[in-house]
C-alpha cells in the first residue's frame, strides 16, 4: 500500500481524460479583499482541509510532481462532473422533460459527487533551488541561469549546489531551500463564497501574517513569536518596507489553484540577498531567525501554524494532518 492510500481513497483519481490544457486566465473582480474579509465553504467537499506535511528536505521537482498529481485529481473530477451535467441537460432537452433517475443511477451520481477532493495544502522544505515565474520565462538567459546554479555560499560549500527550475506560477525569480517553508495550496475557488483569485492571494498573505504572530517562539512552548509583519505595495509579507519575509505566487487552472507561499524561517539569506529576488532590486530578504534571534521555532512549527490560520480565514473548521518523509509518484 502506498503512503498516499493512508490519506483516504477520495484523494487519488488516475487520469482518464488525457492531458490537462493550460489556459491563460485573467481574473477581474470588484470584490474588495481586506484583512478582515471572510469566506466560507459552499460545497461539502470544502469543509475539511487536508495538510500533507513533508518533514524532510526533498528535491523541488519532486514537490512539483506531487502537487501536479493532486491538481489533476481536482481537474479530472471537475471534467467528469461537467460532462455528466452536459449529458443530463442534453437528455432533458431531447425529451423535453426532467429526467428521472432510478435508484442505481442516482447512487452512481451521488458517489461521483462525493469523490470531489478536499482543499489540500502541501508543505515542503526543498533542496536549494532558484525558480523562475512566468514573468521571466521568455527573458532569462543561459548566462543568468549559470550564475544562479554556480552560486555557493561559503557556509554551504559542502552541501548540494542550487538548481534553476522554471515554474508555472506568477512572479519572477525566487529561491527555495533549507530553512524555508513552501506551502502549495490546491483548492477549487468555486467551492467557496466570494473567493476570486486576488482574494485568495490576500487570504494567504493574512494567514502568513497571523501565523508569524501565533507560532510558538520556542519549540514546546506556549509563548507566541509575535512577529509583527505588514503588506506593502509589493507582493508578499514584509517586516518593514525593505525587508521581505514571505513571497507569494499562485497559478489557476479552471478555478483550481496551485503553488502558494514561501516563508523564511532560518534559511541562508545569502542565497536570496546576493541576487535580485522577485524583481525587487532595492529590497532584501529576512527571516524569523534574523528578526528574533533567540527563537527556536522550526519550519514544521510554522507549517502547522500557517495551515491552521489559512483554514480559519477560509471558514474551514476541520484540519486533517499527516506527516510524511516522501510520497511515491507513479506514472501511467
From Swiss-Prot:
<dbReference type="GO" id="GO:0033819">
    <property type="term" value="F:lipoyl(octanoyl) transferase activity"/>
</dbReference>
<comment type="pathway">
    <text>Protein modification; protein lipoylation via endogenous pathway; protein N(6)-(lipoyl)lysine from octanoyl-[acyl-carrier-protein]: step 1/2.</text>
</comment>
<feature type="binding site">
    <location>
        <begin position="247"/>
        <end position="249"/>
    </location>
    <ligand>
        <name>substrate</name>
    </ligand>
</feature>
<dbReference type="InterPro" id="IPR000544">
    <property type="entry name" value="Octanoyltransferase"/>
</dbReference>
<feature type="binding site">
    <location>
        <begin position="169"/>
        <end position="176"/>
    </location>
    <ligand>
        <name>substrate</name>
    </ligand>
</feature>
<dbReference type="InterPro" id="IPR004143">
    <property type="entry name" value="BPL_LPL_catalytic"/>
</dbReference>
<comment type="similarity">
    <text>Belongs to the LipB family.</text>
</comment>
<feature type="site" description="Lowers pKa of active site Cys">
    <location>
        <position position="244"/>
    </location>
</feature>
<keyword id="KW-0808">Transferase</keyword>
<keyword id="KW-0012">Acyltransferase</keyword>
<comment type="function">
    <text>Catalyzes the transfer of endogenously produced octanoic acid from octanoyl-acyl-carrier-protein onto the lipoyl domains of lipoate-dependent enzymes. Lipoyl-ACP can also act as a substrate although octanoyl-ACP is likely to be the physiological substrate.</text>
</comment>
<keyword id="KW-0496">Mitochondrion</keyword>
<protein>
    <recommendedName>
        <fullName>Octanoyltransferase, mitochondrial</fullName>
        <ecNumber>2.3.1.181</ecNumber>
    </recommendedName>
</protein>
<dbReference type="Pfam" id="PF21948">
    <property type="entry name" value="LplA-B_cat"/>
</dbReference>
<feature type="active site" description="Acyl-thioester intermediate">
    <location>
        <position position="278"/>
    </location>
</feature>
<dbReference type="GO" id="GO:0005739">
    <property type="term" value="C:mitochondrion"/>
</dbReference>
<dbReference type="GO" id="GO:0036211">
    <property type="term" value="P:protein modification process"/>
</dbReference>
<dbReference type="InterPro" id="IPR020605">
    <property type="entry name" value="Octanoyltransferase_CS"/>
</dbReference>
<feature type="domain" description="BPL/LPL catalytic">
    <location>
        <begin position="115"/>
        <end position="318"/>
    </location>
</feature>
<dbReference type="InterPro" id="IPR045864">
    <property type="entry name" value="aa-tRNA-synth_II/BPL/LPL"/>
</dbReference>
<keyword id="KW-0809">Transit peptide</keyword>
